[in-house]
A protein has these predicted regions:
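NTP/phosphate- and nucleic-acid-binding module
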Residues: 1-428
Length: 428
């Protein structure tokens, strides 16, 4: 991408929100646009980063046999009444946006258990069709009374939600474990330390649930994590009258070994049992031709929260002043930003074309109205992990490639530059 095409707004880092600095940088750049509280439009950088996260999720789910589908965002009231959740979501919890016209009454999907159960029952009439896992990635809507934290708690957001179908409780638990492993692989590839945490089932229902929490000072949750066993629990568990028995069931024997973290929830998994299949009267035929309810699970990952967490957790400071952020190389939508002095435009454009031809996404800062110093500063507000400056120090033989997070500079022979980014550039 040529930076002149982005029409990036000029910003002053001293004016940035001190609490949600990374997301506020994008807001002031114009890469996030707030239509009203909790409702955003997304620029090129955010969309590209979202696609990267999406592709990682798709790869990890597909390799485990999950099938990508798509359900409607506009869902009829009648299917939510089948599961007895319409009043729960529109009156008791007041979570769902609804609309009513001459065609009927509808809700904008905050989740899709009803659609998934109907869809699955139509395709999975027999035990021979099981197990199956369907997933989608798309926009969801929730009536957050107090939207806050930019993309940490908005009213519209992009989510991966998956739904599994099994013939028995035992098989459901195996699928649940399979999805747990998929989640851990996804978060590892994103460079996020995740703490699986025992969860409340809430309005989703079911018997067992867990959250996937990431440590961040901006989080709203406080968990206690057992590093040895890899088990997290909510802080309020310590106030339970039967806490020792509860912790023992989880395998936690030494409370003093638990470490406290402020976290944000990036994903959750639920063992639903037969809740939806039974309430919606949707069954499969077992080996004896008898109608049996599906044992289901549901699974969610918030893509917007992941991106917000990645940006906020990778902020850069210089002399205690905010400098910007640097995304991990493996997920950055643009791997390197090329800056040049006027007399070196041809060399910079040649390098840019060379990288693009080898599918190494680069930003060429071709703006004419800014000095080289200001253009270098802008590398950090775009989160680009590598930077090449072509100017008077350029010897025509080597490129100086700077890691924007560490400041380490590699001298790379011109003939080796593609190989560097394909192999060595990922070592951050």
């Amino acid at each position: 991408m040529k930076l002149s095409q982005l029409n990036m707004k000029k910003i002053n880092l001293e004016d940035i929100d001190s609490h949600y600095s990374g997301q506020d940088i994008l807001l002031k750049l114009g890469e996030l646009y707030q239509f009203e509280s909790g409702i955003y439009g997304y620029g090129n950088l955010w969309v590209k980063l979202e696609r990267t996260v999406e592709n990682i999720i798709i790869e990890e789910l597909d390799k485990r046999g999950c099938i990508q589908v798509e359900f409607p965002k506009l869902q009829p009231k009648k299917i939510w009444e089948q599961s007895n959740r319409w009043d729960m979501y529109t009156k008791e919890g007041d979570i769902m946006f609804t609309l009513k016209n001459n065609l009927g009454e509808y809700g904008l999907a905050p989740t899709a258990e009803e659609c998934a159960t109907l869809f699955g029952a139509n395709r999975l009439p027999s035990y021979k069709n099981l197990p199956a896992i369907y997933y989608q990635i798309g926009e969801k809507f929730r009536k957050e009374i107090r939207a806050r934290g930019y993309l940490f708690r908005p009213r519209t957001f992009v989510m991966m939600d998956a739904y599994s179908f099994d013939k028995s409780e035992e098989d459901m638990k195996k699928t649940y474990q399979l999805m747990h492993e998929a989640y851990m692989a996804i978060f590892a590839r994103l460079g996020l330390k995740i703490m699986p945490t025992v969860s409340d089932n809430g309005v989703i229902g079911g018997s067992v649930a867990e959250e996937f929490q990431a440590a961040t000072p901006l989080g709203e949750d406080e968990i206690l994590f057992d590093e040895e066993n890899g088990i997290g629990i909510n802080r309020e568990v310590l106030d339970f009258p039967n806490r020792d028995d509860y912790l023992k069931q989880l395998g936690v024997t030494h409370v003093e070994a638990l470490k406290s973290y402020t976290t944000v929830e990036l994903g959750n998994n639920f063992q639903l049992g037969t809740k939806y299949s039974t309430s919606m009267k949707l069954f499969f035929k077992d080996e004896d031709g008898v109608d049996k309810p599906y044992y289901m699970g549901c699974y969610g990952i918030g893509l917007g929260r992941i991106i917000a967490c990645l940006i906020e957790n990778n902020l850069l400071y210089e002399n205690d002043k905010l400098k910007g952020f640097a995304l991990p190389y493996s997920i950055a939508p643009y791997k390197v930003q090329i800056i040049y002095q006027t007399d070196y435009q041809l060399q910079a454009e040649k390098l840019y074309q060379q990288l693009e031809e080898h599918h190494i996404s680069a930003i060429l800062d071709d703006r004419k109205d800014l000095g080289i110093g200001n253009r270098i500063k802008d590398v950090y507000v775009l989160g680009t992990p590598k930077m090449i400056v072509i100017g008077k120090k350029f010897d025509g033989i080597h490129y100086s490639v700077e890691d924007t997070k560490t400041g380490i500079v590699d001298s790379v022979n011109i003939s080796d530059i593609v190989d560097y980014f394909e192999k060595n550039g990922k070592n951050r």
